[in-house]
Every structure is written in structure tokens, then in C-alpha cells.
């Protein structure tokens, strides 16, 4: 627990004869003439955090915010806890282990490297859909997961005994955000007799999901999370808050999925990157916590830091449903009411800007084929896909041409759906859409409909409670009959662990250059993310996932075209089998109860026999195995103790020029490792066969693999290499095309710095610290873009890489770059400040020179310190050694 401040504001709160101390935010606000009720609820939570953990003087920032509805001032945020998943958690624990070694190296106490606040790591990112459409799929996939990841899991188990305040939820339990929502989150925390709002940061961008339960939290990079664990505050500009007023209620066939896709479309257009979004209005009264969580989950997709819902009676009902302790539930209610954190629907809060949405106007929709914000009405999917088809290939593509699949009695063509996945915490946490999908499956079977044979189907819920209520309702059998058998409790298809397709189908796709599709109930559909062979991907509710598995094609308009014929030869349309809200609600009422949650979470930290049998050492410092291809001591601290200086970048080479919306998936892919990639060569050289390559995400504990995987996404397009897809560039020292990794290593060997140019929204997507670590290890000193996504900008700074933006609406196109230029960045020194302007001198091969202004995207003095020390990790280690933290 963090050190407490401003004790004069402590007062007693009695709940069921138990006395708690709380920090009286009403009194503190009154003392500075701040009308607390005019602050958005999310900022009231931050106000309490600053009052409890910081200086009273910093509270004036909130008064300034209310005057201008924004602020340029900094606050220090001290989250109550940290949430991790294994893909981002493994490298974070690797860093902590390396920091212990670094502390020892510079003469400090290694045991100072210990989490000071609770850290929960949920293993959910490693299970893959290898087996599907079978009753034995779950067992087979779990066995495969354990075999592939035993070394990683041993490392995490070592970390659990080596570090204080660190717990691991074993594999096969659930998805971290759903586990957080259903079990870990407290809404109001209490420690040492003091009660305060639950809050967190997580090493996954969808940490935002818990804001639906009124717990303020968002995703950060692993390196920021490490700093937070070790007592370092997260310095942030008090954000603008966009209020979204919700009215009415969902009607007809509209689901929470349709609503979140509408909100994502709306808020992306509004441009809310770096801002809080807060939902309010009478429409909240018709929304369950599950619906709210779906909306909060996709905050990264609409660009916001978080999408917050205040505490109300629905919060209490959800805590009761999920079996939380009665005393805890009463504390939540009494605390919220005492602190003016209880939503009273009076619209008194004031926002930076306001949008309104009538829920009754939401209609059935999907989002795709490449971005979550590209919402398409259900009736327009077929025509919309046909218009998009030409953007996937320069060749003339026909919708009508079909190609035979070897050894099968069917054909496939462009637009056919080859993956239909009920996946992701976004939707599997919501009983209304899960029961809806199961009811649709039941009605489809009763009508004699079947899933098309070329569709790979899967069901991967975010918690064991989902399968429990599906069994309780008797509906699981219908999903099973359609091939939506349980494949695992984890992220699976949503993060690219969709597993291989039928080999004959893969051959047909590759041979004919087909543009086939996936339809999933996930939150991201960036090109190449779901499966390397599905160029088009659409996000949809679980109900529509089942529908598209039945149709097998995007070329069919499901609003007007039949899904098939029943046993009487009569056409069956989607509307004929769509379950009504009344049907769904009845099943939910009869099939879901609190005892399910209590039972399934009673042994959450126990794990399977395989997990329990993993043997680990009891050492406080990790015993690195140099031959390991999973866990390796990273090189970040090789120069720890030596002075780092900020200096101008001279004669740098352009490593790559990228377009808009380059995601962290593009920069550091999480999925499969191509057999022709530099990472594959490294693994092969270490006697790892292709079948055991596993994924990039699973190997994030080994910098050698991850360096080679940086910019290795097969769909990334470097504008220096015309007409070429994948991680290639032109090595200017040799005037030849090479992989980005090989060229970067050549530059480093010759003492040449590298820079990146890019368009808008650079680094959007997952909170993937390797998207910053990788470029740093490749020698990238700066990234110059039109704009950066919030988490990635922070990660770059944390690794000592400078994020810079163009001025005066300039773009890379105005510079007419071809990649052969030499780059100087002038004005970098020990006196730099946040938002400084620097000069960029571009020297062309013909001798021409151009000088432009760039703005440093470093926002706080703390971030300046990270740059001065070389990284946030160096800053933390050196300050811990000197007892400055």
C-alpha cells in the first residue's frame, strides 16, 4: 500500500458496525472552493487518489480543469493494483528479474525490486485453437498449451514465489479482463483500515473493461506497469473528459455488440485519443454491467484512455450476482454515497464536450474488414465487402469464381468465411449475447441447418462460469452440434491464436490468392491479426458469428437471403431463428446465479495437476539459462551506472516509411512465426523445429526472438519497398533490399542511427511494450509521425525512443521521401522540455537539404527524466538504489 498523505481529511465511515477511515473528498473540494459535483465521476476518483497519495497543492489542478474543461498540468496517479496477462506479463517479470541483477551489479539491494502493490497475472494468451469442433478439443488444446509453454510457466511460477504481492492465475481459468470483472475487482478497496476507490493499470489495452464496473483503469506498457509496481507514480496530464449521454434503450435485434460498434465508430470520428470518456444519462438505467463492460472493453478501439460508468444500483446487483462478499458490497454502496461517487442521474457533471446517442437507433451491424471503427449495417455487409474486395489485391478479383478444395466435396471463393469464432472477453462476458447465440444455434438445428464445411468454428469463453450457465440452460449441446465446442478459456482467435486451417483449404487459398474472411466476437480485426490467410475480418456479436458460420459467406445478404432450407424444403431466414429479448432474458433468469461464480472462483489460483507439478527454484535472483529460447536476460542494463546523455541525432538512416494506422501488431506481431523470417532462422539455429516455433507472443521473454520479430508482420507495408508486403527495407549502406532486422543490425554495426517515418495513429492497438523495446534494440532513435496512439507513445518514451510529430499539417508525402535520405535531428540536449520544438534536417542524395520543425511528444517532466536516464527502467533502478523512491 502506498504512503498516505493529507491526514487532516481522514474521517470515519461506519458500515455494518465496521469502522473505516476515508479521505473526505467533499471537505477537500470545499476547502479549495471546488464544486465537486460538477467534476465528472472519473475525475472525482482521480481527485481522491491525489488527495490520498499526493500533495494538497496538486488538487488545484482539478479546479483549473473545471474552469477550462481541460488542463495542461500534471498529476501523479497511484493505482491500487496492477493486472497482467502472460504475453505482456512474462517480459515484465523478465525485466524485474533483470532489474534485480542490475541492482546487485551497482551495489544495491536486489530485494528492493519487489512489487509494493498487488499484482495479478492471468495466463490467458497462450492457448491456441489447434483442435476444434470436437468434444475432446479442450483437453487437446490444454495439453498442447502446456507442452509448448512449460518453460514460460515455470518462470512465472518462480516469479510468484520470488516476488512479494505477485499472484498468478494458472492457464485454463479465463481471460484476465473477465476474471477481473467477475472476481478480482473490488470497486472499493480497503487496506490498513482505509477505504478508497479500486483502481488499476494493466499490461493489456483492454484493461479498460473494468470501467464498466466503475473501477477506473486503463492499459499501459509493461515498463510503465513495472514502475507502478515499484512505487513510481504514473505521471499524467489531467485529461479532457468527453461525456456521452445515453438515452432510450436497445430495441429489436440490437445487442450490446452492435452498441459498442456504433460507439466505436462515433468516438473515432470525434478523436478521443488521450481523453477519458464518461457515460451518463437515463439510458444507463436500461444497461446491465455486462453491457457496460462490453462498451468499456473497446475503449482502445475508439481511442480513449477509458470509458467510465459511475457506480449505481446496477453495480450493486452485479456484485451480488457474482458472489462478492456481502460486507464488501455494503462498503461499496455506503462509500460511494458518502463520497458523491454514486450516480444520481442529475446531469450535474460538466464535460469537455458532449455527444448524445439514442440507444433505440442502434441496429444490427458488424465492423470490418480491417478496422474496428469501420461499422457496417448487417444489410450492407455483402455489398460493402464487394466494394472493398479490390483493395486487397491489384488483380481483378471475382466474387463468382469458385475453386475446388482437394479431397473435399465443396468449393470456396473470395468472400467465403473460413473462421467463425465465439471468442474474447468483449462478448463472452455478456450473458445476453452468449445465450442469444446458443438459442440461435438451437433454432437452426431444429430447422435442419448446418455449418458450412469450410468454416472453422470455436468457442473460447472468458471464464468457466460461461460454460456452467450454458450447461445449466441445456443450450451447450446445440452449440456443440454446430461445431462451437469449447476449445479453451483464453483469448485464442481474438489475438491471432486461431490455429491452422484445414491444409487443403490453406492450399486452395494460397494457390488462388483468395480473399477469405473470419467473423469473430472479438475487439480487433487488423489485417493479418486473426489469421495470416484471412485478409478480411469482421467483428460481430456471438449471435451473428453463428449466423455467418451457417451462411459460410460474406457475399450473402443475411437480411434478405435464406440461410438454407428446412426439412420441408422451405427457406429459412435469419429472422426466423433470431431469439427474442424475452426468450434470452428468461433463460438468463433461470440459468445464472451467484453460486456458479462462487464455485468456479473458489480455487482460481490452484490450477491443474500439470501446473501444480511444475518445479521451480526458491532463489530470489533468477538463474538464467543461456540456451533458452523463451527466457533470456535482456541487454537493457549492460551500461547501468554509466551516465547517459541526450544529444542530437546525426546522419541517421530511415529504416522504414509507414502509412496510417500502423498498429502494434504490425510493429511487433503476436501470432505465428513465419518459416522464412529472421526469428525462424534464429530458432532453427537453436535446434527448434518449425512445429515448436510457437508464437511471437509466447517468446516475448527472449529479446533475440523479439528483435528479429520487430516489423516482421507479413501484412506490413514499408513505402520504401514498392509493391512488397512484409518486414523489408532498403539497406542504404548496401543499396539492397533486406529484412528490416538485417538492415538494422548492419546500421548498428556501422554506428549508424535509425529513424522511422509514419502517418496518423502510429502504434494503435494493443499495449505492447515490445513495439517499443524492439525498435530500441534495432537502433531506432526516433519515430516521426503525424500522430501517436496514447499507450505506444508512452512506451517509446519509456524505452528512450523519441516520439516526434510534424507541424502545420505536414505529412511524409510533403517531404517526398524515398528512404535514401540522411536525417539530422537538432536541438536535443540536457535542457529539453516537454513539447519542445526541434529541427529535422533532411539531406537527399543529390545534395538538396530541407529543414522542418518537429514537436517532441514528451508530455511531463518525469518523462524527460526517463529519456535522460536512457529508459524508465534505468531511472527506477538508480532511484531505488539511492532511496529516492
Swiss-Prot record:
Annotated metabolic or biological route of this protein: Carbohydrate metabolism; tricarboxylic acid cycle; isocitrate from oxaloacetate: step 2/2; Organic acid metabolism; propanoate degradation
Pfam families attached to this UniProt entry: Aconitase (PF00330), Aconitase_C (PF00694)
Keyword terms, alphabetized: 4Fe-4S, Iron, Iron-sulfur, Lyase, Metal-binding, RNA-binding, Tricarboxylic acid cycle
Gene3D superfamilies recorded: 6.10.190.10, Aconitase, domain 3 (3.30.499.10), Aconitase, domain 4 (3.20.19.10)
Transmembrane segments: none
Signal peptide: none
GO function terms (MF aspect): 2-methylisocitrate dehydratase activity; 4 iron, 4 sulfur cluster binding; aconitate hydratase activity; metal ion binding; mRNA 3'-UTR binding; mRNA binding
One GO BP annotation of this record: tricarboxylic acid cycle
Cofactors required: [4Fe-4S] cluster
CDD domains the record matches: AcnA_IRP, AcnA_IRP_Swivel
InterPro entries listed in its UniProt record: AcnA_IRP_Swivel, Acnase/IPM_dHydase_lsu_aba_1/3, Acoase/IPM_deHydtase_lsu_aba, Aconitase/3IPM_dehydase_swvl, Aconitase/IRP2, Aconitase_4Fe-4S_BS, Aconitase_4Fe-4S_dom, AconitaseA/IPMdHydase_ssu_swvl
Cofactor detail note: Binds 1 [4Fe-4S] cluster per subunit.
Binding site for [4Fe-4S] cluster: 425, 491, 494
Catalytic activity: citrate = D-threo-isocitrate; (2S,3R)-3-hydroxybutane-1,2,3-tricarboxylate = 2-methyl-cis-aconitate + H2O
Purpose of the protein: Involved in the catabolism of short chain fatty acids (SCFA) via the tricarboxylic acid (TCA)(acetyl degradation route) and probably the 2-methylcitrate cycle I (propionate degradation route). Catalyzes the reversible isomerization of citrate to isocitrate via cis-aconitate. Could catalyze the hydration of 2-methyl-cis-aconitate to yield (2R,3S)-2-methylisocitrate. The apo form of AcnA functions as a RNA-binding regulatory protein.
Family label: Belongs to the aconitase/IPM isomerase family.
Oligomer and partners: Monomer.
The protein, known as: Aconitate hydratase A
